[in-house]
C-alpha cells in the first residue's frame, strides 16, 4: 500500500499543461532542415558521413490553438535547444510553449551542426511548417513489423545474462501511424511510432540517421519533396533489431584483438568502433553489411508505414487539440558496485526521489504520450491496454531532459546493463508512468467536454 500511495501522489501533485477545449477545422503543414555537420568539422575519430541527419517538423492547429511534432536524427535530448525553440515558436508563431512534442530518434550515429546553428535550423523547420499550414484531414492506422526483438537474454552458454535476441521475450510489433493530408488530397506528413533501438550503424563511426533516418527518407520519397515522415521511437528500452549478427560478430573480433594485447573486454563495450582493425577483411565485410542493413531495415519499416497509410479509410477534419505535462517523482537508487556490462548482482543504496517527465499531445482521439526516459516495452503495452483510447502510443526520449532506462517491474530480475544501471527502484516507475499518462488523457478529455 505504501508503494501505491507514493506513485499516485507523485503522479498527481506535480503537473502543468496547455489545454484547448475547442473543436475546429484542422490545419497542418510540414518541413525539415538538414542538420548534418560538414565533413571538415567532424572529429578525427570519424570516418565520414554515411547519410544525412534532419530536424523534421509537423505543425497543426484548429483555429483555437497550435501544436507540433518535432524530431531529430540524434541520440540524446537537449533542454537548451527545446527552451530556445519554444520561446521563439510561442512569440513569433503563436505555438504555446509546451505544445511542441520533441523526440530524438536515438540513432547511435547521429551528429549535428553546432548548437546555435541547430537552434536556427530547427526553428526554420518549425516556421516553414507553420507557414505552409493548409486545411487538412488526419487519419490513423496500426500496422505490424517483426523487425524488433527483446534484447535481454539469459545466455545458456555463458550461464548468465547477456545481450542477444530473446525470441520468446515480450516485444510489441505495432507500427502506429498518424497521417496528415490536405483536403484536396495532397500528402503533408506522417508521424510513425515503432519500438526498436537505432544501433545498426554504431560501430561504423560515421554520421548516420540509422534505420529511422532510412525509413523516413524512404517514406518521403514515395510522397514527394514537401512530405515529411517523422520517426518516433516507441518504448524500446529493451528492444533491438532482430537481425544484429554483424554487431555480435564484430564484438567477438574486438574481444579477441584486445585479448591479444592483454586486455579483457569480454564484459565491456568500448564506444563505437574503437579498437577495431578496419584493415581486417572480415571487419570490412561486416561493416559493409551493416551499411546495407541500415537501408534494408529502413525500407522494410517504411513499406509497412506506406501500407498503413494506403489502407486508411476514415479521416477527420474538425479536431480538438490538447497538450498536457507532468513531472513524476519516484524513489531512486544508486549503484554501489560494478562488474562489467552484464551478468552480476547489482548492489544499491536508496537516494532521494528521481524524476520522469511526461507529455501528452492529444489530437482528437489520438493520445500521443511522451516520456523523457527509455522505458521497457511492457510499460507501453500496459498503457495501451489500460487506456480508454485504442489509438494510444508511447514515444520515448521526448522533450529535453534524459532520465535513463526505465525497466518494467517484472524485468528487474534481469542482470542486463539497462537494469543494472537504472536509477529507478523496482515497483514505482512503471505504475507512475501509466497512471500519469491516464490522468493526462482524462484531463484532456474532460477539458474537451466542458
Regions found by a protein language model. Give the residues of each.
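Conserved beta-alpha junction segments in alpha/beta enzyme cores
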Residues: 22-450
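Positively charged n-region of N-terminal signal peptides that target proteins for export
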Residues: 1-4
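Bacterial N-terminal signal peptides
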Residues: 6-16
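Sec/Tat signal peptide C-region and signal peptidase I cleavage site
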Residues: 17-21
Amino acid at each position: 500500500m505504501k508503494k501505491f500511495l507514493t506513485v499516485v501522489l507523485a503522479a498527481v501533485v506535480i503537473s502543468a499543461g496547455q489545454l484547448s477545449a475547442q473543436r475546429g477545422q484542422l490545419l497542418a503543414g510540414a518541413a525539415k532542415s538538414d542538420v548534418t555537420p560538414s565533413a571538415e568539422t567532424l572529429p578525427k575519430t570519424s570516418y565520414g558521413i554515411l547519410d544525412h541527419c534532419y530536424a523534421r517538423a509537423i505543425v497543426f492547429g484548429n483555429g483555437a490553438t497550435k501544436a507540433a511534432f518535432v524530431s531529430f536524427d540524434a541520440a540524446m535530448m537537449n533542454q537548451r535547444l527545446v527552451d530556445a525553440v519554444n520561446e521563439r515558436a510561442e512569440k513569433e508563431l503563436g505555438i504555446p510553449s509546451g505544445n511542441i512534442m520533441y523526440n530524438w530518434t536515438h540513432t547511435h550515429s547521429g551528429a549535428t551542426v553546432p548548437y546555435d546553428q541547430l537552434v536556427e535550423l530547427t526553428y526554420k523547420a518549425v516556421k516553414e511548417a507553420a507557414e505552409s499550414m493548409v486545411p487538412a484531414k488526419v487519419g490513423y492506422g496500426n500496422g505490424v513489423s517483426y523487425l524488433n526483438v527483446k534484447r535481454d537474454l539469459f545466455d545458456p552458454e555463458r550461464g548468465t545474462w547477456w545481450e542477444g535476441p530473446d525470441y520468446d521475450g515480450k516485444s510489441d510489433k505495432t507500427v502506429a501511424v498518424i497521417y496528415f493530408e490536405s483536403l484536396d488530397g495532397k500528402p503533408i506528413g506522417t508521424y510513425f511510432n515503432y519500438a526498436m533501438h537505432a544501433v545498426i550503424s554504431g560501430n561504423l563511426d560515421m554520421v548516420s540517421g540509422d534505420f529511422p533516418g532510412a525509413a523516413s527518407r524512404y517514406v518521403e520519397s514515395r510522397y514527394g519533396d514537401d512530405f515529411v515522415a517523422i520517426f518516433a521511437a516507441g518504448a524500446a528500452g529493451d528492444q533491438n533489431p532482430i537481425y544484429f549478427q554483424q554487431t555480435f560478430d564484430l564484438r567477438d573480433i574486438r574481444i579477441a584483438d584486445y585479448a591479444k594485447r592483454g586486455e579483457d573486454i569480454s564484459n565491456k563495450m568500448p564506444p563505437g568502433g574503437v579498437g577495431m582493425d578496419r584493415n581486417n577483411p572480415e571487419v570490412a565485410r561486416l561493416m559493409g553489411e551493416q551499411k546495407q542493413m541500415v537501408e534494408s531495415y529502413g525500407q522494410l519499416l517504411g513499406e509497412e508505414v506506406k501500407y498503413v497509410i494506403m489502407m486508411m479509410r476514415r479521416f477527420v477534419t474538425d479536431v480538438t487539440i490538447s497538450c498536457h505535462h507532468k513531472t513524476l517523482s519516484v524513489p531512486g537508487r544508486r549503484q554501489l558496485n560494478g562488474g562489467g556490462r552484464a551478468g552480476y548482482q547489482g548492489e544499491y543504496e536508496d537516494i532521494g526521489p528521481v524524476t520522469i517527465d511526461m507529455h501528452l499531445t492529444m489530437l482528437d482521439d489520438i493520445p500521443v504520450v511522451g516520456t523523457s526516459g527509455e522505458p521497457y516495452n511492457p510499460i507501453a503495452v500496459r498503457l495501451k491496454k489500460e487506456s480508454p483510447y485504442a489509438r494510444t502510443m508511447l514515444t520515448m526520449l521526448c522533450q529535453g531532459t534524459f532520465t535513463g532506462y526505465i525497466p518494467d517491474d517484472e524485468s528487474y530480475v534481469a542482470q542486463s546493463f539497462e537494469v543494472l544501471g537504472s536509477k529507478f527502484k523496482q515497483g514505482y516507475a512503471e505504475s507512475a508512468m501509466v497512471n500519469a499518462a491516464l490522468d493526462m488523457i482524462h484531463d484532456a478529455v474532460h477539458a474537451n467536454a466542458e
